[in-house]
């Protein structure tokens, strides 16, 4: 009698478990037209977290390109830092092959020693 009840349990379990073809057809329905998944459908983990934050206009891991500013005293380029100073590299001119490196300290905006572009250090919190 136990053997019969065990067989019934196995049969019920098989009926509740989706088959491979059922799972595949469900996945295909979620893919973009043509059967290739979009980035949103395929992204997982940190990549998905970054994509969702970017949609909201956030950059929690500071991986996106910084927003360009005029570089004037009134509108300096903002440089995020977790400390009170940071080393900055300025290319100065578009076709320049060298980088001018200098220390940027917390406080007022500072100028590049070569071209005069203004930079300002701003506090940045690390994503935890």
UniProtKB/Swiss-Prot annotation:
GO cellular component terms, A-Z: mitochondrial inner membrane; respiratory chain complex IV
Keyword match Acetylation: yes
Presequence extent in this chain: 1-30
Tissue: Expressed in testis. Not expressed in brain, heart, liver, kidney, spleen, lung, duodenum, muscle, epididymis, vagina, uterus and ovary.
Domain of life per record: Eukaryota
Residue positions, PTM N6-acetyllysine: 67, 85, 120
Biological process according to GO: mitochondrial electron transport, cytochrome c to oxygen
Database matches in InterPro entries: Cyt_c_oxidase_su5b (IPR002124), Cyt_c_oxidase_su5b_sf (IPR036972)
Keyword field contains Transit peptide: yes
Localization of this protein: Mitochondrion inner membrane
Keywords: Acetylation, Membrane, Metal-binding, Mitochondrion, Mitochondrion inner membrane, Transit peptide, Zinc
A single GO molecular function term of this UniProt record: metal ion binding
Residues involved in Zn(2+) binding: 90, 92, 112, 115
Function per UniProt: This protein is one of the nuclear-coded polypeptide chains of cytochrome c oxidase, the terminal oxidase in mitochondrial electron transport.
Further details from the record: On the 2D-gel the determined pI of this protein is: 6.0, its MW is: 14.7 kDa.
Family: Belongs to the cytochrome c oxidase 5b family.
Protein name according to UniProt: Cytochrome c oxidase subunit 5B, mitochondrial
Annotated organism of origin: Vulpes vulpes
């Amino acid at each position: 009698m136990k053997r019969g009840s065990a067989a019934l349990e196995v049969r019920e379990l098989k009926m509740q478990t989706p088959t491979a073809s059922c799972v595949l057809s469900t996945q295909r329905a979620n893919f973009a037209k043509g059967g290739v998944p979009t980035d949103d459908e395929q992204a997982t983990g940190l990549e998905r977290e970054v994509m969702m934050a970017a949609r909201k206009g956030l950059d929690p891991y500071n991986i996106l390109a910084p927003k360009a500013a005029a570089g004037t005293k009134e509108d300096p380029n903002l440089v995020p830092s977790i400390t009170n100073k940071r080393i900055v590299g300025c290319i100065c001119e578009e076709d320049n092959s060298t980088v001018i490196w200098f220390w940027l300290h917390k406080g007022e905006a500072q100028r590049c020693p070569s071209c005069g572009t203004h930079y300002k250090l701003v506090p940045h919190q690390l994503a935890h």
